[in-house]
């Protein structure tokens, strides 16, 4: 069973449903989903799961492996089992190691979520993770300890020895509008804003995202007219 924790924010709830649907329609293995939104962990105007993602090992009893994906602003275009098969038991965490400066100074433009889009070291590394919950490096991360840690320390994995931060292929966390368009993308990450928002309605992969919305709602439309 693939365990997949995905971010959920009520302000872009449709995005969570789209992501889950896109995973389920393509997976070759059973998937267990846990939308993640732990109250009280949000410290700023960012999404509701910005810090709670680091509690996945604690939630899991420091056992097994799990995937965390931002989810609410992602579209899965491949079999999630392919990602699951990339897990390395020697690593504490595996991520796509982005190294970029954003082309955009604002994100979620035109919505109540609109905010500055700051560039910083290891930006978006934590937005897609294969987490080895049993690795000793995670033992220091608890609901109590996380309160005293800064956002940058968490998102840059300063609590994990560099040797135990593994690399995943870029196709599994493609930053839409930041990276050149490619049809080989496995997970499209609408990090600036999902196509439900007017500003991003025609961005790359928006058509596929909107097709997934129709897939999510078509049975409702047919059965509850």
Q: Where are the predicted features?
A:
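Conserved catalytic core of nucleotide-sugar-dependent glycosyltransferases
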Residues: 85-153
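Alpha-helix N-cap/loop-to-helix initiation residues
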Residues: 12-13, 76
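Short amphipathic alpha-helical segment that frequently serves as the phosphate-/nucleotide-binding helix
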Residues: 13-21, 51
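Short, acidic, metal-binding catalytic loop of nucleotide-sugar glycosyltransferases
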Residues: 22-30
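A glycosyltransferase accessory/donor-loop signature
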Residues: 1-5, 11, 17, 28-29, ...
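GT-A fold catalytic core of metal-dependent nucleotide-sugar glycosyltransferases
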Residues: 52-104, 130
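A short acidic, often aromatic-flanked loop/helix-cap motif at beta-alpha or helix-coil junctions
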Residues: 39-43, 101-103, 173-177
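Active-site-proximal specificity loops/subdomain of glycosyltransferases
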Residues: 31-62
């Amino acid at each position: 069973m693939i365990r997949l924790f995905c971010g959920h924010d009520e302000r872009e709830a449709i995005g969570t449903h789209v992501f889950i649907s896109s995973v389920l329609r393509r997976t070759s293995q059973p998937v267990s989903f846990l939308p993640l939104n732990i109250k009280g962990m949000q410290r700023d105007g960012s999404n509701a799961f910005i810090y709670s993602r680091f509690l996945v090992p604690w939630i899991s009893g420091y056992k097994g492996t799990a995937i965390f994906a931002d989810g609410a602003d992602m579209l899965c275009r491949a079999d999630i089992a392919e990602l699951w098969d990339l897990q390395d038991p020697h690593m504490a965490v595996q991520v796509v190691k982005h190294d970029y400066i954003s082309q955009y100074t604002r994100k979620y433009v035109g919505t109540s979520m609109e905010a500055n889009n700051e560039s910083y070291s290891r930006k978006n590394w934590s937005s897609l993770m294969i987490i080895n919950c049993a690795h000793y490096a995670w033992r220091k991360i608890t609901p109590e300890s996380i309160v005293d840690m800064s956002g940058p320390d968490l998102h840059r994995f300063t609590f994990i020895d560099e040797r135990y931060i593994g690399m995943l292929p870029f196709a599994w966390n493609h930053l839409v509008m930041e990276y050149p368009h490619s049809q080989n993308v496995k997970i499209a990450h609408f990090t600036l804003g999902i196509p439900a928002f007017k500003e991003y309605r025609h961005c790359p992969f928006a058509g596929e995202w909107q097709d997934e919305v129709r897939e999510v709602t078509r049975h409702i439309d047919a059965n509850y007219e």
